[in-house]
Swiss-Prot record:
Stated name of the protein: Ribosome-recycling factor
Gene3D superfamilies associated with the record: 3.30.1360.40, Ribosome-recycling factor
Gene of this entry: frr
Family recorded in the similarity comment: Belongs to the RRF family.
GO molecular function, one term: ribosomal large subunit binding
Protein's organism: Desulfatibacillum aliphaticivorans
InterPro entries per record: Ribosome_recyc_fac, Ribosome_recyc_fac_dom, RRF_sf
Length: 185
């Protein structure tokens, strides 16, 4: 019975880690990445549309992103969406292709990015701890209902804490790696 509680907690914590990793993909490291534009949507015939659904996005060089719209009439809309996105990118176009040169991060921008990573790390840990709380409440209610003995409930809570500690360490490791990428020159 407790195995189900552990398994559910692990699955939810895995999802929290996946959400953190997805969020960290959008944090700039000074190199071009397709995921940088994931959250950017353009107004495509009245519908908010991700850029990669209206154009071919490529990375020909480590510090350059090219965007070739399938419909040349939306080139200005794509540019506008990128400028509004608060990514600090300046697109330029030649009428057919948008080019985005990724500038090296300034020291101040690097510090901002590290702060953002730390904030995301804390949010990830909070998610994991909330899942721990839910699992512990499930165990307590099982004990209260008489489904498990008191000593088993304490062992269950210890196991949930071990699982939580493992996932908090994963969050720390993932964010430390991202921080290292940001601070690399």
């Amino acid at each position: 019975m407790l195995e189900l509680v552990y398994e559910e907690a692990r699955e939810k914590m895995d999802k929290a880690i996946a959400a953190l990793e997805k969020g960290l993909l959008r944090v700039r490291t000074g190199r071009a990445s397709l995921s940088m534009l994931d959250g950017v949507k353009l107004d495509y015939y009245g519908t908010p549309t991700p850029i990669n659904q209206a154009a071919t996005v490529a990375i020909p060089e480590s510090r350059l992103i090219t965007i070739q719209p399938w419909d040349a009439s939306v080139i200005k809309d794509i540019e506008k969406a990128i400028l509004k996105s608060d990514l600090g990118l300046n697109p330029s176009n030649d009428g057919k292709i948008i080019r985005i040169a990724i500038p090296p991060l300034t020291e101040d921008r690097r510090k901002e990015m590290v702060k953002l990573v730390n904030k995301m790390s804390e949010e990830g840990k909070i998610s994991v701890r909330n899942i721990r709380r839910d699992a512990n409440e499930t165990i307590k209610s099982m004990k209260k209902d008489g489904d498990i003995a008191e000593d088993l409930a304490f062992k269950g809570q210890d196991e949930v804490q071990k699982i939580t500690d493992d996932f908090v360490k994963k969050v720390d490791d993932i964010c430390a790696q991202k921080e290292k990428e940001i601070l690399e020159f």
